[in-house]
Curated annotation (Swiss-Prot):
Gene3D superfamilies tied to this protein: DD-peptidase/beta-lactamase superfamily
Protein name as catalogued: Glutaminase
Catalytic activity: L-glutamine + H2O = L-glutamate + NH4(+)
Matching NCBIfam families: Gln_ase (TIGR03814), PRK00971.1-1 (NF002132), PRK00971.1-2 (NF002133)
GO molecular function, one term: glutaminase activity
UniProt cross-references to Pfam families, sorted A to Z: Glutaminase (PF04960)
EC code(s) of this entry: 3.5.1.2
Sites where the protein binds substrate: S61, N111, E155, N162, Y186, Y238, V256
Alphabetically ordered keywords of this record: Hydrolase
Assembly, per entry: Homotetramer.
Name of the encoding gene: glsA
Class of enzymatic activity (EC top level): hydrolase
Length: 302
């Protein structure tokens, strides 16, 4: 496995320079673009990694999975009264579909859906940002995971579209807490800094029927685990989820920080990171690396 990971990074490295680092978040625009890392973690605790897999980066929308899991833990099926679990077919920050569907987001991984999930969690936790940080630390076994306040502040200063979505949902009665307070929590979730190794470990419960090896806790039950993996498979890569399923064939979730997490149910989790994005906002070299890994080992769920 170690040799294979090294080979794959060598093969996809020429793609660096063809994408573009996210620049709509000023604090992310200065990230060094030629970084590339990959980590594979098995449900038995075996770890393999290559490249910049130990270097922390801004996980951004990957955090939406952690938020969803927290909401499922304390509210269960009730969350689906306020949002759906269908692909949107629209940009992740679209307002048009949200208004047409009367303030009920299509799924928890578009921005509006993630904000509803954060609103649900805001009602549950006295300090949502801290609760999220502590939750993630338990999942990955790394007490050094922190939220980057500079990135969070930068995103908060450019919050207009997310605020518009939240207030639109509030006008339809689907947002219960103070919008600014929820946005504060949301951006601190997105600004969490984790490495490929951290994320591969943190997501391994989704490859093991909801059981987290590091904390020894049953994070989700088997049915809930299947549901989260299903939503990742259909909606985890913005409006490129179909292409990712076609090329990689695994449940996944991406973020504009350049990270992608993928789950091989019953076996492994894989995290790749390369900051340069394609036109859909997903890591260009990251998708190519996952495609090669899936092809060579036969990990596709299809």
């Amino acid at each position: 496995m170690q040799q294979l990971l090294n080979e794959i990074l060598d093969e996809v490295r020429p793609l660096i320079g063809r994408g573009k680092v996210a620049d709509y978040i000023p604090a992310l625009a200065g990230v060094e673009p030629n970084q590339l890392g990959i980590a594979v973690y098995s449900r038995d605790g075996e770890l393999f990694h290559a490249g910049d897999a130990l270097r922390p980066f801004s996980i951004q929308s990957i955090s939406k999975v952690f938020s969803l899991v927290q909401a499922i833990q304390h509210s269960g099926e009730d969350i689906w009264q306020r949002l759906g679990h269908e692909p949107s077919g629209q940009p992740f920050n679209s307002l048009v579909q949200l208004e047409f569907e009367r303030g009920k987001p299509r799924n928890p991984f578009i921005n509006a859906g993630a904000l509803v999930i954060c609103d649900i969690n805001q009602s549950r936790f006295a300090a949502p940002a801290q609760s999220m940080r502590d939750f993630v630390r338990r999942l990955c076994g790394n007490p050094e995971v922190v939220s980057d306040s500079v990135v969070a502040r930068s995103e908060y200063q450019h919050r207009s579209r997310n605020a518009a979505a939240a207030y639109l949902m509030k006008s339809f009665g689907n947002f219960h807490n103070d919008v600014e307070a929820v946005l504060f929590s949301y951006f601190h979730h997105c600004a969490l800094r984790m490495s490929c190794v951290d994320l591969a470990r943190a997501f391994c419960f989704l490859a093991d029927k909801g059981f987290c090896k590091h904390s020894g806790e049953q994070v989700l039950n088997e049915r809930q685990t299947k549901q989260v993996n299903a939503i990742m498979a259909t909606s985890g890569l913005y409006d490129e989820a179909g292409n990712f399923a076609y090329r990689v064939g695994l449940p996944g979730k991406s973020g504009v920080g350049g990270g992608i997490i993928a789950v091989v149910p019953g076996r492994f989790t894989v995290c790749v990171w390369s900051p340069e994005l394609n036109a859909a906002g997903n890591s260009l070299a990251g998708i190519a690396a996952l495609e090669k890994l899936s092809e060579r080992i036969g990990w596709s769920i299809f």
